[in-house]
Amino acid sequence: MNRTISKIKKGIKNPSMVRSKIFHSILMALVKDDEKYVKWDYWWGLGKFPNLDNPQTYNEKLCWLKLNARRPEYTKMVDKYDAKEFARNIVGDNYIIPTYGVWDRFEDIDFDALPNEFVLKTTHDSGWVIICKDKSKFDKNSAKKKVEESFKNNLYYYHREYPYKDVKPRIIIEKLMVENGGGGLKDYKFFCFDGKVKMLLVATGRTVDTRIDFFDRDFNHLPFKRKYPHALKPIAKPENYDKMIEIAEMLSIGIPHVRVDLYNINGQVYFGEMTFFSGGGTVKFEPDEWDYKVGEWLKLPKE
């Protein structure tokens, strides 16, 4: 009951999210062809259909990649457990957030063996985590319901992002990472093109009031937005920024485009995840000219 009330409140606060879910539910039911689906999905986000015969913008090129550059190895790179192993093999263990375990079933988790604090999420899904700061107060029933709900999801179908289609749903529990001073963690998301960082976004206030700012490789603020407003205060260049660039580029070698998400916690860099289609290729740039500018960096493969 409380969960239902929470969903209703969330829908009231964000009616556009409700409309999007309704539209995509109808689209998934009616349109099975991937190309037709991608075109209508793009239309919903940007108000027009993409030019897939001669894509020019960043969003159009992401849509083209979804349909034409399907590499099976990408599946492991988006699996939240396998991606850590992929990164570990390239950059080493020092940059990987410790994992306490991975399970196929919630019932198999031995919570008595876990530390007092941890983070629980699923390996195939996105957009949520469960943070436990005191195991004695951890609501297992609520967590189990959230996991069961997540296990029903397959991110492939929402935007036709093919790497997610065959990711096995599992539960992963990791160490809770905390910034000294109590500030929330910042997400640093590096947009890599053929193994080179061209820009990054910094996400702040993720749990309360999400703000997103874009920067070029030299950490100069870029004058555009995508979906979220800019931060209220200037964002300082993080410590070990050059190391973050180095790690992102090591992980993106040989890939036309991938977003490498990193954390910089108390001066230590940690790998987060990898994303091949930022925003699903359906999120507007404001102003629109930046969709074309960023699109120039993405060189589509000939395969």
Segments the model singles out, each with a brief description of its role:
Residues 166-170, 214-269:
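A long amphipathic alpha-helix within ATP-dependent nucleotide-binding catalytic cores
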Residues 1-69:
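Membrane-proximal basic amphipathic "stem/tether" segments
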Residues 51-135, 142, 149-162, 170:
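A conserved helix-loop-beta module that forms one wall/lid of the active-site cleft
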Residues 94, 183, 192-198, 255-257, ...:
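Coil-to-beta-strand transition motifs
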Residues 103, 124, 175-177, 192-194, ...:
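Short, flexible loop/turn elements at secondary-structure junctions
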Residues 114, 138-228:
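Phosphate-binding site of ATP-dependent enzymes
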